[in-house]
Regions:
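Non-catalytic alpha/beta scaffold blocks inside enzyme catalytic domains
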Residues: 1-23, 27, 36-42, 49-57, ...
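Conserved hydrophobic/aromatic pocket- or pore-lining residues that grip, position, or stack substrates
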Residues: 33
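Long, low-complexity segments enriched in small/aliphatic residues
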Residues: 224-273
């Protein structure tokens, strides 16, 4: 009754409701509330999903084609450890093959912290990872001793964002996008290294051809300049690299004013599908 009578009522959901048994129904129910109560497309309302935002798109590191085409859902990786060769396309949703040939024996987890506390059954997952005859090696790269890092055979400590140069966009900032040119405010401590250095060293040990293919002969700073130059080529309104570095923060308002979810349905009463 309170939700139905409140105007506006801002209704949104995070990333938790669907992470449980039949959680997709919970997610759908939350999304239905603003539709039923007339809170879609009004000031202060929302669509029931995560809020939208205007952002300045950044250029990310190019990825080579993955030669491995077989895929499983992100939720079934524990099954792939325990009974990988038994998993099939029909029963378990394996993609790219009729069945898995081998179980998961190695996990590389970068800044994820999803090994334990974002899975459905912590105790079951704990027991699976305790058996080193199953998943034999876990590598975790992070800034903190997370729950996932505690299960790692090898922990590689990454640098924090305040310890290295980078360009990052806004996350959820509403109707104004921005770029921040990060500059170190403190020197790296102890033996921690940036992820690009870590991956470059791994590539180097796989062979000089792999190292060259991965780095393309660029340092981390050279990659940053190269990727930003591609951004400027697509968006000439952006300041130059050196100007952005001097500014620190570049802001831009949404040229359309604001984003309206299901705009066609709200303005011309088209049905929401």
């Amino acid at each position: 009754r309170e939700i139905g009578s409140a105007k506006p009522a801002y209704i949104c959901q995070g990333w938790g409701p669907q992470r449980q048994a039949n959680g997709e129904q919970t997610s759908r129910a939350i999304a239905m509330l603003p539709i039923l109560t007339g809170n879609v497309g009004i000031n202060g309302g929302n669509s029931g999903a995560r809020e939208s935002t205007y952002t300045i798109t950044i250029e990310r590191m190019p990825l080579p084609e993955n030669p491995v085409k077989t895929q499983i859902s992100c939720f079934s990786w524990t099954d792939a450890i325990v009974r990988g060769p038994e998993m099939t396309a029909l029963r378990d949703g394996v993609r790219g093959k009729d069945k898995l040939d081998v179980p998961i024996k190695f996990i590389w987890n970068y800044a994820g912290n999803t090994i334990i506390n974002q899975h459905s059954d912590i105790n079951k997952t704990h027991d699976i990872l305790q058996d080193e005859s199953k998943c034999e090696t876990i590598v975790v790269i992070d800034n903190f001793m997370t729950s996932s890092a505690k299960y790692a055979d090898i922990v590689l400590p990454d640098l924090m964002t305040v310890e290295q140069e980078d360009i990052i966009p806004n996350d959820y900032a509403g109707n104004m996008g921005y770029l921040i040119f990060l500059q170190p405010v403190t020197a790296p401590k102890f033996e921690r290294k940036p992820i690009y250095w870590i991956m470059s060293e791994v590539a180097k040990r796989l062979g000089p051809d792999i190292h060259q293919k991965f780095t393309e002969g660029r340092t981390q700073e050279q990659w940053l300049r190269y990727l930003y130059a591609k951004m400027v080529a697509k968006d000439p309104l952006l300041p130059s690299y050196d100007a952005l570095k001097k500014m620190g923060i570049y802001k831009r308002k949404d040229p359309n004013g604001h984003f309206v979810a299901y705009k066609n349905s709200v303005t011309i009463r088209m049905p929401i599908r």
